[in-house]
Design a protein with these regions (language model features):
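Membrane-embedded, hydrophobic transmembrane alpha-helices
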Residues: 1-16, 114-118, 124-128, 144-146, ...
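General nucleic-acid-binding
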Residues: 52, 161, 168
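Membrane-embedded helix bundles of polyisoprenyl
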Residues: 26, 34, 147-163, 171-254
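Start-transfer (signal-anchor) and selected internal transmembrane alpha helices
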Residues: 1-44, 166, 174
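Secondary-structure transition/capping motifs at alpha-helix termini
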Residues: 136-140, 165-171
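Membrane-interface coil-to-helix junctions
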Residues: 24-154, 183, 196, 203
Length: 254
């Protein structure tokens, strides 16, 4: 009995080590793209800002900056421009231009004091993470988001490997993680410069699936509740990250 326990423990440690290696390989391959960019900064950087390879990236980064500055969504003139502007909708030029009325003293004081009413839940999770990590990168939001990509895009490998290990096919979990992270579509959408929600769109569903599996295999009511809470939390974070409620409903249907 003791020998079986030791063998199982050794197998678990060996699998954990190999799984960690697969995760690091995925991280380093993506980070190597950034190192290649640094060799030709004139082509890939504007000052200290790395270029973006998706149109959504400046959108998330701007919201991260506005959240830190306390002006989140106070002005949203860049969204839906020019079709969202009143002038465009009216399809005519204004007859005259007038200055806006000067703000009262009380309103000026309230604006200068920032916007303490901004809730973290109102900010997309990707922007929230970048906003809080940007001080570690000298408030360079572009660099912060870029360096998050290799780690976040590779995270799904860990719960995927653990899932297949728990059902008795660990090799499938390891190969699935490696094939998945370097699959053409996912690799393209999670490469350096793609600051977008694709980075964690595999991680949260796979994590929820793992926790549901663990809840089904749990021996005590306490563990069932803990794993179920974890699954609910992962789906909550997925909703905050991607804002597509259909995925959560699909899990309830299953």
């Amino acid at each position: 009995m003791a020998k079986i326990f030791i063998d199982r423990k050794n197998n678990s440690l060996l699998f954990a080590a190999v799984l960690l290696v697969c995760f690091l390989v995925s991280v380093l391959v993506r980070y190597q793209q950034f190192e290649t960019w640094k060799k030709t900064p004139a082509a890939y950087f504007v000052g200290e800002r790395p270029m973006m390879t998706t149109l959504d990236a400046p959108y998330w980064l701007r919201w991260a900056r506005e959240y830190n500055e306390g002006i989140y969504k106070q002005k949203n003139g860049l969204r839906a421009y020019p079709g969202g502007t009143d002038t465009f909708k009216e399809m005519s030029l204004p007859l005259k231009y007038t200055d806006t009325a000067p703000a009262s003293k009380s309103s000026s004081l309230s604006l200068s004091s920032g916007s303490p009413g901004i809730s973290y839940r109102d900010v997309p999770l990707i922007s929230y993470l970048i906003a809080h990590l940007s001080p570690f990168f000298n408030n360079n939001y572009y660099l912060t988001g870029t360096l998050l990509i290799p780690v976040l895009a590779s995270l799904f490998i860990l719960p995927l490997g653990m899932y297949f290990f728990r059902i008795g096919v660990p090799v499938s979990g390891l190969l699935g993680g490696l094939i998945g992270t370097f699959a053409g579509g996912y690799y393209m959408r999670s490469s350096i410069g793609r600051i977008d929600t694709d980075m964690l769109n595999l991680f949260f569903p796979v994590l929820a699936g793992l926790l549901i599996l663990l809840a089904g295999k749990a021996k005590t009511e306490r563990n069932v509740l803990l794993y179920s809470m974890g699954a609910g939390l992962s789906l909550f974070l997925f909703q905050w990250w991607y804002e597509k409620a259909g995925f959560t409903l699909a899990y309830f249907m299953v």
